[in-house]
Amino acid sequence: MDPRKQYEGHLKDYPLTNYPDYEPGHPPRSERLEKIGFLDEVEKIWGSRWGGSGGIGRLREVALIKPTEHEVDPLWEKDRNFFLLRRVRVDIDRLKQAFEDYAQVLESLGVRVRWMEAPQSWGAYGPMRKLFMGAFPLVIKGGAIVSRQGQASFMRGVEVNFTKFFASINCPILHTIHGHGICEVGVFVPIAEDVIMGFKSCASNDDGLEQVLSVFKRSEVKEMPVAHSTTIIDDFEAGGEFHVDMVLGVVDIRKVVVYPGYLDYNIYRWFKDREFQIIEVPKDEHHKFYPANLVLIEPGKVIMAKGATETIRRVRAAGVEVIELDTTGLMAGTNGIRCVTLPLVRDPGPGLD
């Protein structure tokens, strides 16, 4: 019973028997409270069960962040390599329109879109870039894990905006990565109910993974395989991808899209040992469209980059419905669909058992 939603009487008439530690005429029987878990109470206290990335069930709610003129400040052009501007100069009008188009697609599919503000644009070392990126924190069963960035110093500080946002929507923060931990946990990939793929790279170290795993255990995550991602040193063309969601996407239960050029062998074996169908992304489509960076609406239904025609053909041949989205505007901001998306609520979905 949720008393806030179901009780309609006067306060003075509220039945004391609704308190689980109540015994007439005695102090609270506190030992009874030890049997009640956080997840048993989260919706009653916070108003929602939360959990956008704990599994692959039907997506119900996301947050997006509208890009602003801040993203085209001349400062970023002083050194494009340092500011990770791999492609053409950011076109703010195309980027804004891409967000509007994406939001319309989500809403047409029954997904609620919350628009998040990013008022803090200065971080630990100066102005921050990529403030419209939603996939830094992770929302699992019960609440959010707030990330600590490792890809670049100009991202150190975005967690303030996310912390304020979670407070504004009554989403509890379960943990903030701290100490010497680094973990851009929002790009972890849910594989099935209570199975989430982590990764190690410049964007996720051992300390960060250890912190995340301790939270996962209390939020009913049963397994966290860890991919070893590639890196960038001097040249974007020679480098790889430091986020696992750039090379791996789930399209259905036991069906994944991967770019094998940046997928480590242990993860390949992990999928094969569990009888996953692996759909390969062609090299040219990976570098042009990042088709593995997709958004799962529900098992067997995904949003993918429109230009990746061969990957889409292969995904459809595997029995998956694909909604195509023109991502050229997003790509002008050097990002894929999933990079800008913060899933907040999903239905329970299928597991691997």
Each predicted region: which residue ranges?
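The feature marks the mature, well-folded catalytic cores of soluble enzymes
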Residues: 1-353
